[in-house]
Structures are given as structure tokens and as C-alpha cells.
């Protein structure tokens, strides 16, 4: 134990020295590029993984525990939507490490990786959970457990719905929908590697490990029609309407291209069956930019009267009702709309 403590202290001390030099260089240059930020932000994961490895080694023996540095086994490439794993190279590197240095318990660093040139990078927001899913997929694990500060995926936001309960079983589709539309427990990107290999994900509470948590798998246990309700506030509706749109191909393509070029994310799309209007929901912070770029994209049609208006409705909220059991079940929409109507909530768009 004394030797392990001394070894960790030496590594920690050397890293602190390197960190000082990196920060001193950034201060002198008065700038820090992406590479510097990746290196600095990765130290926490390196230290915590090595510390856990040392603690486990002290308990069960150093020969049974290994710490592979994720920078040597996970290879990623930067794409427009974020880092993408180079699966073949990562799998080969990981298997080689496990063969050359086998152990009963492997503690792998989360959040950090390397590009094809061996330069350190990070997986960005929710990178640690994403790492767990990636390694679970690479190892074809029987299960991936994500430890958080809540009991699992909730049926609604408990701050708004006091009797919200933990959803003990969800399908991948249900979890993806809830995550995309506001549930903060797990990021949609985190689930992608696990889904590809059909590895179940379990969400557990670090502070209450006795709780069973939420299990996310290809098929969920039957548990009613609606699994959860979630929402996003701070939404703006951009409505493009005009008789000149009817039967004209390419209108939607031009609309989405204009928003894409401006870097504006679309939350929801709704189009009238008559093709007289298209409504999209965007973050309210981007409402002015969205209004401007859509106006420029259809400037000719607006001046000619083919399109009557580009209307912006602010301070809207998006409400999603999620559940695989709703498919083919009559009356669900009627209950939702009835409840909203009783509460005097106006519905502006449906998808």
C-alpha cells in the first residue's frame, strides 16, 4: 500500500508540474486552443481512474487490477457533429492491451481519447458516460451501468410533477425520445454505441445504490401506454405560410438549408397537409437569426406575395409524451389534448 501511494503521489506530482507549464504557456500567449483545453480538462479523469485503480489494488491485490490509459486504446475522428469512434482501430488496440496485460478488474479512463495521429482529444459534453457506452460496446458487455445522482429516468420532471416516479424499464427508443426532448439523465449520443451492440444500459444512483434504477434495453417490460412526459422551455415557432407554396417542390429543403447554414437546430417540424404552411420550432435564443435567414431565403417570394408571412411566436414550450405502447392505441391523443384544454393550454403545432 505504501509503495502504491508513493507511486501515485509521484505521478500526481509530475502531472501537476506539467499542468503548471501548460497553463503558464497559455497565460504568456494569452490564448488557449482546443488542444490545450483537451489536455488540461483530461487530467481529472486520469487522476481519478489511477486513484481508483490504486485503491482497488490495495484491496484485492495489484496483480488483479489494471489501468489502461484510454488515450492508447480509443481512437476518434472529429466530424461535424462531434467526435466519432474509429471502431476497428479502437477494438484492435483494446484487445491487444487486454491480451498483453490481463486482469480481473480493468479501470479505464473516461472522457479522453486520441486522434489518428496520437494527439489527445476529448469526447466533449457527457464524454464520460459516452466512454462507458463505447467500451461496453467494444467489449460486448452484458450490461453497462451509468452511475448518476438520481434514482433513474423519471416519468416526468419531479420539480414540476411531485408524484413523478422512476421508470424501471424502457426501450432504447423510449429513452432516446425522453433524452432528446429534455430528460437530462442520459444523453442520446451516449446510447448509440450500446444500441449498436444491443447492450442494456442501467441508470443507478451513486448516493443510493440500493435503488434498482432504470434499465434501458431493446425491448422494455410492458408497463402501460405512456412511459414518460418531458418538455423543453424557451422555444420559438417559425411559421412560413403562403398559397404560393402549394405544390411547389423544394420549399422545405430551402427552409432547412437556410437554418442549417446559420447553425440553427430544429426541434420540431410540422407541415399542413395542404402544403400551405410549414412550422418549425427552434431555440428561442436563435429566433431572431432564424427569422432573418428564412426571410432572406424567401425574399423574392415574400416580395411577390407568393409567401404571405414569416411569423415568429416566442415563449413557447415543447411537450413530448413518450411510450412505445401508444402505437395503435386509440384515445391517447384525446387524453393529452383534453388535459391541455382543461388547463387552458393552447396547442400551436403537433408532430
What are these model-predicted stretches?
Residues 143-147, 201-203, 267-268, 349:
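Short hydrophobic alpha-helical runs that function as membrane-insertion/retention elements
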Residues 59-60, 197, 262, 343:
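Conserved dinucleotide-binding and phosphotransfer motif residues
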Residues 1-191, 281:
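Nucleotide/pyrophosphate-binding catalytic subdomain
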Residues 213-351:
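A conserved regulatory-domain signal marking ACT and ACT-like small-molecule sensing domains
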Residues 197-211, 233-234:
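Active-site C-terminal subdomain of aminotransferase-like
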Residues 64-66, 200, 346:
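Conserved beta-strand segments of alpha/beta enzyme cores
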Residues 5, 24, 199-202, 295, ...:
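Non-catalytic alpha-helical coupling and interface elements of nucleotide-dependent molecular machines
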Amino acid at each position: 500500500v505504501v509503495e502504491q501511494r508513493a507511486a501515485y503521489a509521484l505521478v500526481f506530482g509530475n502531472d501537476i508540474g506539467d499542468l503548471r507549464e501548460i497553463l503558464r504557456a497559455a497565460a504568456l500567449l494569452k490564448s488557449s486552443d482546443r488542444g490545450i483545453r483537451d489536455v488540461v480538462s483530461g487530467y481529472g479523469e486520469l487522476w481519478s481512474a489511477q486513484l481508483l485503480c490504486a485503491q482497488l489494488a490495495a484491496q484485492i491485490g495489484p496483480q488483479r487490477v489494471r489501468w489502461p490509459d484510454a488515450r492508447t486504446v480509443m481512437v476518434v475522428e472529429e466530424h461535424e457533429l462531434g467526435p466519432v469512434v474509429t471502431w476497428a482501430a479502437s477494438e484492435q488496440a483494446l484487445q491487444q492491451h487486454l491480451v498483453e496485460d490481463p486482469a480481473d478488474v480493468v479501470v479505464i479512463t473516461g472522457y479522453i481519447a486520441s486522434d489518428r495521429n496520437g494527439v489527445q482529444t476529448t469526447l466533449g459534453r457527457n464524454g464520460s458516460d459516452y466512454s462507458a457506452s463505447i467500451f461496453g460496446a467494444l467489449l460486448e458487455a452484458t450490461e453497462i451501468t451509468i452511475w448518476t445522482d438520481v434514482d433513474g429516468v423519471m416519468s416526468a420532471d419531479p420539480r414540476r410533477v411531485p408524484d413523478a416516479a422512476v421508470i424501471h424499464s424502457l426501450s432504447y427508443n423510449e429513452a432516446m425520445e425522453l433524452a432528446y426532448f429534455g430528460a437530462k439523465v442520459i444523453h442520446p449520443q451516449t446510447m448509440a454505441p450500446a444500441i449498436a451492440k444491443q447492450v442494456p444500459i442501467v441508470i443507478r444512483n451513486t448516493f443510493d445504490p440500493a435503488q434498482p434504477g432504470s434499465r434501458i434495453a431493446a425491448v422494455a417490460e410492458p408497463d402501460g401506454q405512456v412511459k414518460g412526459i418531458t418538455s423543453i422551455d424557451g422555444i420559438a415557432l417559425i411559421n412560413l405560410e403562403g398559397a404560393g407554396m402549394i405544390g411547389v417542390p423544394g420549399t422545405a429543403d430551402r427552409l432547412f438549408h437556410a437554418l442549417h447554414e446559420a447553425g440553427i437546430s430544429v426541434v420540431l417540424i410540422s407541415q399542413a397537409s395542404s402544403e400551405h404552411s410549414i412550422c418549425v420550432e427552434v431555440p428561442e435564443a436563435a429566433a431572431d437569426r432564424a427569422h432573418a435567414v428564412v426571410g432572406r431565403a424567401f425574399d423574392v417570394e415574400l416580395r411577390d406575395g407568393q409567401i404571405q408571412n414569416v411569423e415568429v411566436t416566442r415563449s413557447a414550450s415543447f411537450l413530448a409524451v413518450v411510450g412505445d405502447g401508444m402505437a395503435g392505441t386509440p384515445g391517447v391523443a384525446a387524453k393529452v389534448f383534453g388535459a391541455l384544454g382543461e388547463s387552458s393550454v393552447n396547442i400551436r403545432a403537433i408532430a
